[in-house]
Amino acid sequence: MGAMVPPSRKSCYNFRVTEINRVLDGDTIDVTIDLGFDLYKKERVRVAGVDTPEKRTRDLEEKELGLDATAWLKDKLEGAIDGDDELSIRTELVGGVGKYGRLLGWLYIGDSNLSLNEQMITEGYAWAYDGGTKQKDFETLREIRRSFGTLIE
C-alpha cells in the first residue's frame, strides 16, 4: 500500500462541480463540471488514492462495508448535492483521466484543505490505493470504524 499524497493547489487542475448526478459507490461519482465560458461537461470521477469495498458482490461482509462507504460518501456530499456547499475536484493529470477513462480526482468540500479521499481512509471507509495490488483487509476497516463509533454490528 503506497502513500497517498493529494496534489497541492498550485500543482494541479481544479474543477468546480456544478451538479452531483449520482454516487455510484464509495469511490466513483458522476458529476457535471464547469469548464468556464458557460461550458459544462458530465464526467465519471474515480476518487483518487482510495479503494473502497465493493457493494455489488456476493461476499456479504464486503457488500455491507461497500454499502456503508457509499452511504458515507453520499452523506458527505449532501451539502454539495443540495447546493449549500461547493464541491471541487483536483487532479494532477493533464486531462485528469485514468486508464478506465474516468477523471481521477481529489474531492474537496468548500474551503477545506482535507480531502474527502483522506477522510475516507482516516475514518475507515476506504484503504489507501496507489494503483498496485489491492489489499482488502475488512477487519482493519472495522477496527478503525469501531474507534470512531461508526460501526453498527
Identify what each model region corresponds to.
Residues M1-E153:
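Small beta-barrel nucleic-acid-binding modules, primarily SNase/OB-fold domains
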